[in-house]
Amino acid sequence: LAQAMGKSSDATLSMKEASKVWMKDIREWQDARGKTVVDPMKEAERLAGGRLSEHAEVRLLRATSILHELLQKSSEGEDAARALYIAGRAYDQLGEIGLWNLHEFYYLACIDKAPHTATAEKCYRSYDETMTLGYSGSSGVHLPKSVKEDLARLKEKAMPTKKP
């Protein structure tokens, strides 16, 4: 499909660029088949992190696949929260393919899995940014009272506890 799209006479320049990136990422994926990944979390971070191209869908979907496998093995604690955070960031970037607000649920689950940790704080900040952006417009940011209250509650739950 990716190859056919790039070769289609009807394909726009953007579609042809996407095809090139997808084909490169698919080749990388094929080359990695059968190789043992020493640290799946780091591999997911590599695939989903850093500055990704505009057409990083293949890499992001690979990362989410790894993360879902990790979450099936261990769905509690800081590692699970970290996996949920990375998945949230990946789904945030994948939003344009129709997964709209799925990333928000990952951020919320991350906060629930490991409250009062640095990972939960990162998840809260990403969730807060998403909510703020969602209620932004040309006249400014207009967060409903219920959303502000929810954000305050989540912030309290997410922020690492300060040691006396």
Predicted segment positions?
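Acidic, polar-rich low-complexity tracts and alpha-helical solenoid repeat scaffolds
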Residues: 1-164
